[in-house]
Swiss-Prot record:
This is Virion membrane protein OPG140. It is found in: Virion membrane. The keyword Transmembrane helix applies. It comes from the Viruses. Changing residue 88 to A: No effect on phosphorylation. Pfam families: Pox_A14. The modification Phosphoserine is found at residue 85. The gene is OPG140. Envelope protein which is a major component of the mature virion (MV) membrane. Essential for membrane biogenesis. Is required, together with OPG144, to form bona fide crescents, which can progress to form the immature virion (IV) membrane. OPG140 and OPG144 form a lattice that is stabilized by disulfide bonds and serves as an anchor within the viral membrane to which several other proteins important in virion structure and morphogenesis attach. One of its GO terms (cellular component) is virion membrane. Signal peptide: none annotated. Homodimer; disulfide-linked. Interacts with OPG144.
Length: 90
């Protein structure tokens, strides 16, 4: 749960880092494709790794924000208590 609290505290920073990685992947791909010589493996690997990490971080942050709105522990426990009587809780 410490990881969730850390992500909650630095949500905007992590989301910005994911967007920056996506921008970097576009820059690396542009550098790779703009060469007149044969493309080097280094720029391809940098572009692919930046893209994959950027997508994982960005989609992960979107999923985390939905989790915080709909599945946070205080919301789930509140729903359980309102939907069940005291007898079924015991």
């Amino acid at each position: 749960m410490d990881m969730m609290l850390m992500i909650g505290n630095y949500f905007s920073g992590v989301l910005i880092a994911g967007i920056i990685l996506l921008i970097l992947s576009c820059i690396f791909a542009f550098i790779d494709f703009s060469k007149s010589t044969s493309p080097t493996r280094t720029w391809k690997v940098l572009s692919i790794m930046a893209f994959i990490l950027g997508i994982i971080i960005t989609v992960g942050m979107l999923i985390y924000s939905m989790w915080g709105k709909h599945c946070a522990p205080h919301r789930v426990s509140g729903v359980i208590h309102t939907n069940h009587s005291d007898i079924s809780m015991n």
